[in-house]
Regions:
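ATP/NTP phosphate-donor binding region
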Residues: 1-84, 272, 292
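Accessory alpha-helical/coil subdomains and C-terminal extensions
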Residues: 2-11, 15-19, 25, 40-49, ...
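Short, well-structured alpha-helical segments in soluble
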Residues: 75-88, 241-248
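Short acidic, glycine-rich surface-loop motifs adjacent to enzyme active sites
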Residues: 87-102, 249-263
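A short helix->loop->beta-strand "cap" motif at the edges of active sites that frequently abuts
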Residues: 90, 115-118, 279-284
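Short Gly/Thr/Asp-enriched flexible loops that form oxyanion-binding sites at enzyme active sites
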Residues: 95-117, 169, 266-275
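Internal gly/pro-rich beta-alpha loop/helix module
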Residues: 121-194
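C-terminal non-catalytic interaction/assembly regions of soluble proteins
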Residues: 260-329
């Protein structure tokens, strides 16, 4: 734990997990050929001034490229968040994270924490070694949100925009403002250190406390796979998963998310296989692969839909549902 400022009534704790924001390349003009997770979170805070009345502290939770994010890191991160959120002098948390799976981690934390204080994930599209890194400004903005008196819930801050964990998606491979909230739009903007709120902060999930307890106690997390519906899609991958399950494999599939076209439509061959999987006890959920919009339910649908959740977020929701079912059974 590195304390950056000592004299204050309220603290913002920055938890580091790696990512591009802590990446380093061999040349300052190289924004893509870097190694993620090279710079410690305490070093990222050098030169970052705390807002008035706030002390900064840093804790390294993990140091990975976020493409390699794991359930084990998620569990540890959730536990460290819960620890700090219980501290009475904590104003809020900031988590530095890679952009690739940031939306998954944000959604997971929103589902298992019930924060009455802000938990702010931030990131960078350029490594720390870049000529003009975007990480320092994103970190300043994230700290401003974490210190905002009325802020709460799990949010993402990137390029001056604040997104809800439920709606945020990475929508660009390279641009600095790589995230978007689709139809819902952003929650707020950060302008010269001031937070301009546009809509309500995220509400806590009533099931979060129970979900947290279950993931903390779980020896294994349910296996949930994502399969894409597309032209000439087939059910062979579903059949492979079912055959592995029938043989009593060490980690049998328990859930399948279908990344569906349009308003939740699925190729007939893939749908037939998914219905067979459902009949054999596998939980199946449809989520639209469209960047915006939600699935509007239609009568007679035999496969559940995930509403406005993206396939990767639907996977997390289904995993937590399966954990709850196992606990109840």
């Amino acid at each position: 734990m590195d304390h950056i400022s000592e004299k204050s009534a309220r603290r913002v704790v920055v938890l580091g997990t790696g990512g591009t924001i802590s990446g380093r390349a061999g040349a300052a003009n190289d924004n893509i050929g870097y190694t993620a997770g090279e710079v410690g979170v305490a070093d990222l805070l050098h030169g970052i001034d705390a807002p008035a009345g706030i002390a900064l502290a840093a804790e390294q939770v993990a140091q990975v490229d976020s493409k390699d994010m794991s359930f084990a890191i998620w569990r540890t991160l959730a536990q460290r968040c819960a620890h700090w959120l219980a501290e009475p002098d904590l104003a809020g948390l900031v988590i530095t994270h890679g952009t690739d799976t940031l939306e998954e981690t944000a959604f997971f934390l929103q589902a298992v924490l019930a924060p009455s204080k802000p938990v702010v994930l931030t990131c960078a599209m350029r490594p720390a070694s870049a000529l003009a890194p975007d990480g320092p400004q994103n970190l300043r903005d994230a700290i401003a949100v974490a210190a905002a008196p009325d802020a709460r819930g799990v949010v993402v801050v990137c390029a001056g925009t604040v997104h809800s964990a439920v709606e945020v998606q990475k929508v660009h491979t390279y641009r600095l403002d790589a995230f978007d909230s689709g139809d819902a739009g952003p929650l707020a903007y950060v302008e010269e250190g001031a937070v301009r709120q546009l809509r309500d902060w995220p509400q806590a999930d009533p099931a979060a406390r129970s979900s947290f307890d279950r993931i903390a106690a779980a020896t294994a997390w349910p296996r949930v796979e994502i399969l894409l519906s597309h032209a000439e899609a087939r059910g062979s991958l579903v059949e492979m998963l079912l055959e592995e399950r029938r043989r009593g494999g060490a980690e049998p599939v328990q859930g399948i998310v279908l990344a569906a076209t349009g308003n939740g439509t699925v190729h007939q061959a893939l749908e037939a296989a998914a219905l067979r999987a459902q009949a054999e006890g596998v939980s199946v959920l449809r989520a639209t692969r469209c960047a915006e919009g939600r699935i509007l339910p239609k009568p007679g649908q035999r496969l559940r839909d995930a509403g406005a959740l993206t396939p990767v977020k639907a996977r997390i929701a289904l995993m937590l549902e399966l954990l709850a079912d196992a606990s109840a059974g």
